[in-house]
Each structure stands twice: as C-alpha cells, then as structure tokens.
Amino acid sequence: MPRMSETVPTAAAGRSPQEAEIVAALGDRPVVLIGMMGAGKSTVGRRLALRLGLPFLDADTEIESAAAMTIPEIFETHGEPHFRDGEARVISRLLDGGTKVLATGGGAFMREETRDRIREKAISMWLEAEADVILRRVKRRADRPLLKTPDPAGTIARLIAERYPLYREADITIASRDVPHEKIVDECVAALHDYLCAAPPQP
C-alpha cells in the first residue's frame, strides 16, 4: 500500500528572528530539497519545516497517493519512464501550492523541465552525501527500485557520476554526513538566511 501523504504541524509563533526573516524572504516560494536516495531529504526536510513553521511534503509520498501504488509497484508495473512522467507532474503541482519544504526523489532534478520549474518557483537545496554514506544508509531499506542490482555500490557510483553535475546547479549545497540531524538543520537554516537575507556586498 502507498504511504499516506503527510505534513508536519507548523510552529510559526516559535520562530527565531532569523527563521522569521527566512520565511518572509521566501514569500510564496517553497524550499526544495534535492539529492541522492539516502541523503536525508525527508528526515532533514521534516525537521527544517518544523523549525521554519512551514508544511512539509514528500514528493514520493504524493506520487504514491496520486497513483494509489507504491513506487516499487509503479516501477514494476509501468517502468521508470512512466514514473518519471508522473513525478514531474506531481512536483509541478506542488511547486504551485505556496510556501513549504518539499523533499524530492533522487532522479527528479535530472529532468530539465523540473529543474527549470524549481529554478523559477523555488529555492533549491542539495544535500550532498558521499557514496559510502549513501550505501550504508540505503542498505537498510528494501524499497529502492534502482538498487535492485547485483552491484549496489557500482550503481550508486554511476548515479553519482550522472547526477552530481546537475545537482550542483542548486541554489544552496549542504554536506549530508553522519552527524546529528539538528546540526544539518542548523546549517540549512544558516545557509538559507545567508542566501535570502544577507546584505549584498558594498561596492
């Protein structure tokens, strides 16, 4: 069965001045998390949304809800191209839904039209993880269709080579590593504030 769509409760009244400045500067733009499977987009995204007092949505969960199938079932029944088409439609819809934190699947940013829409309508944040970190994390999960291969480490290396050049187009890059999640969230908040609110350099 597909997972239920989810949001997190907002806590706007508890925002720090820095967090309030970020939300004001965002306007109606979402913060979109991109990166490889296992980079921590959903975990960090939920916590970042709580810090900013914004809704959180996971694009993969929304895709499953729209299709009434899990992502592995979509891959098995219809194939990856069908999944990517649906993914692009869902993300396009979510980008029009106001300010939020949105976690996207690892392959979503590879589609040019999706990159263009994110660039136009959102602030993109890449959670960059090393191959060994990704492999260690995803080995615990059985629901990764692209890793159902005899050589998961080789598959991850290939995906990194394909995807990281495009991920580098993100507005903000955060190193995802094995530290407490709140430390990563602190870095996300600081980077968002620097990107959105820092005064431009004086001439």
From Swiss-Prot:
Alphabetical keyword list: Amino-acid biosynthesis, Aromatic amino acid biosynthesis, ATP-binding, Cytoplasm, Kinase, Magnesium, Metal-binding, Nucleotide-binding, Transferase
Disulfide bond sites: none
Compartments, as annotated in UniProt: Cytoplasm
Entry cofactors: Mg(2+)
BP term (GO), one: chorismate biosynthetic process
Function: Catalyzes the specific phosphorylation of the 3-hydroxyl group of shikimic acid using ATP as a cosubstrate.
Protein name: Shikimate kinase
